[in-house]
Amino acid sequence: MSWLAALLSLLLWAAPAWAIQPLDPSAAVVEVLQMPVSTAQRQCWLEAEASQWEPWLKQQAGYRGRDLLWAPERQQAVVLVGWQSQQQWDAIPASSIGPTEEAFNAQLRDCLGVSDQQPLPLQRAGALKPLQP
């Protein structure tokens, strides 16, 4: 019976990550975002990603899923966001990003109990293009 309790605990703990659409390997361009995320911040970060960014991203033309990666030894997170084309990614108005970014930061502030305007500031942002075989 203890295996069932362990399985249920794992399912309940991991459920928010299931809400994230995996990165499509056929994405033509991959947005790369890097930020500091400590062990203590990890769960709040995952929840805010799933509840704030994922619904917004799913509404954007050309969105091809994403992967959330975390390096515990460096306390770093990397978000890879796939886009069908650079043009579709570039066509997203900056004004539409702001409200989602603020909601993401507000959820992080509440969850982490901090007052920082941007609790997990971006350290790097850029794009990569997949190698074609």
Residue ranges and their predicted role:
Residues 1-7:
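Bacterial N-terminal signal peptides that target proteins for export
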Residues 4, 15-30, 67-75, 101-133:
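Glycine-rich beta-strand-turn "strand-cap" elements at beta-sheet edges
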Residues 9-13:
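Hydrophobic alpha-helical segments of integral membrane proteins
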Residues 32, 49-52:
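Short, aromatic-enriched amphipathic alpha-helices that serve as compact interaction elements
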Residues 36-49:
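Short, surface-exposed ligand-recognition loops at beta-strand->loop->(often short) alpha-helix junctions
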Residues 51-64, 82-120, 131:
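An amphipathic, aromatic/His-enriched active-site/gating alpha helix that lines ligand/cofactor pockets
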